Amino acid sequence: ITEDEPSRVIESLDSFIPENRNQPYDMEKIILDIVDDGEHYPIQSNYATNIITSFARINGNTTGIVANQPMELAGVLDIKASEKAARFVRFCDAFNISILTLVDVPGFLPGVEQEHGGIIRSGAKLLYAYSEATVPRVCVVIRKAYGGAYIVMDSIGLGADKLFAWPSGEIAVMGAEGAVDIINRRELAEAEDRNSYKEKLVKEYNKKFSNPDIAAQLGLIDNI
């Protein structure tokens, strides 16, 4: 039995996300703030540390938590992390345990080793695990939610029952710098001062797109 109210206000969460989008933070601290009595039971905590899988109670109910860990490899999904999370989601579904997913994922880990090892196959395991799960599922976008890696992290397309985003959430194909390099490559090539012009474009892109407002307008998230 917990004395923590599910509707309690946790003021520390308002300032937890760094202003610098590339600065890491400890996702486990967020988990400890939102679960009952500040306690959780990590599973395979020393394996694929770029993703957290754990059990906790929320409002007294046993909950499985899947969360990217920005402190390790920036929270990217690689083969080991994808398969670790997929197995955990399958376990929760088998024993009727609700799933909370906390998302801060910049993408899949690139590289020949990952490709030859079957990163697409491993990512598909996580995608299928979520899409076939019948337990209640809530997803919260904490910061980065980029490309295919976001899709496999219990996006609305996989049937999440509720999907929320913090004001710091960024739901996009890629980060601002990569997007600017592609969208504005001609302008950048012709610019006298490429660096300053790119910096200006990145700021404009972040202001316009690096927020959850457009996703909310399109019905891709339920609330901010």
Q: Which residue stretches match the model-derived regions?
A:
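Ligand-binding clefts of soluble mixed alpha/beta catalytic domains
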Residues: 1-224
